């Protein structure tokens, strides 16, 4: 497979293109990008036909900020309308046995118009693939996932991703329901972040009732809502007013203070969350200060992106975090993602696993 197909938010094609080019080159692969504005996907064409498969194995998908999903694939054009199933099966005849089939479209208005067609063709296509022993009847762990990305009703990229290095979600999107009692739609960003960044088997222990948390820039309480919902006690930091229902839970203490100046009196905070509108480097510096001083164990924060050079801006901030934490000998895990519920921003998760006591004692 010479092509790597990457799904992204419409309008972020240049950022996804810059990112795959960067990571492919870092692993020693060469190629070029094909991208059109507002299409919701980009194609990385490898100069070596075998390298598409190698890229989706060797580049860690968790390091891809702007990619919602990816797969190694090939383009099928002008499929006969009377036998599109046969055309897809023929293109996939040499695939390793896959655990499941995902028939998808780009997340654009044009793509959404194809979703009904995708659902309609999925059943006969899956049966045909099962018959040819290309896709299993029942999903099985640790097997590749087959993708068919329809661009039109007779044009599609057909390929596969590896279950250990992809997004588990259809179209790479985790869809969440807006709680009717949440103070703002921003609540979905933190809900998605917990689901994306924290492995399901660890969620109960790492995001647990009784934990102490801090929400910087909390007003009116969209992110605080998610912390309260999970049973945490929250210090909400904001000069603005908080939602009355949240305050009546008894789990929230409101501090009218500047989020950039506030620091906790004790180092007993498990979660720090922050969704303040400020320059990304300024927010990053604040988060580094909290991490280096062991004020919180895990941090989730948003970086508001500039109109241009969004890829450069994000990677500059991630490099700042790595450089500072490594300078002080701090052990950590770092991941960033342009989540489905994000807009002109990305969400970062920093898990501080060990801070030398000499830094803050």
From Swiss-Prot:
Entry annotated with the keyword Transport: no
Enzyme class, first EC level, given as a word: transferase
A Pfam family annotated for this UniProt entry: RLMM_N
This enzyme's EC code(s): 2.1.1.186
Superkingdom of origin: Bacteria
GO terms (BP aspect): methylation; rRNA processing
Gene3D superfamilies to which the protein is assigned, alphabetical: 3.30.2300.20, 3.30.70.2810, Vaccinia Virus protein VP39
Compartments in which it is found: Cytoplasm
Catalytic center residues: 304
UniProt xrefs under InterPro entries: RlmM_FDX, RlmM_THUMP-like, RNA_MeTrfase_FtsJ_dom, rRNA_MeTrfase_M, SAM-dependent_MTases_sf
One GO CC term, this protein: cytoplasm
Keywords (A to Z) from UniProt: Cytoplasm, Methyltransferase, rRNA processing, S-adenosyl-L-methionine, Transferase
Ligand binding (S-adenosyl-L-methionine): 186, 219-222, 238, 258, 275
Main localization category: cytoplasm
GO molecular function: S-adenosylmethionine-dependent methyltransferase activity
Catalytic function, reaction form: cytidine(2498) in 23S rRNA + S-adenosyl-L-methionine = 2'-O-methylcytidine(2498) in 23S rRNA + S-adenosyl-L-homocysteine + H(+)
Function: Catalyzes the 2'-O-methylation at nucleotide C2498 in 23S rRNA.
Subunit structure: Monomer.
Similarity comment: Belongs to the class I-like SAM-binding methyltransferase superfamily. RNA methyltransferase RlmE family. RlmM subfamily.
HAMAP family per record: 23SrRNA_methyltr_M
Protein name: Ribosomal RNA large subunit methyltransferase M
Native source species: Pseudoalteromonas translucida (strain TAC 125)
Gene this protein is translated from: rlmM
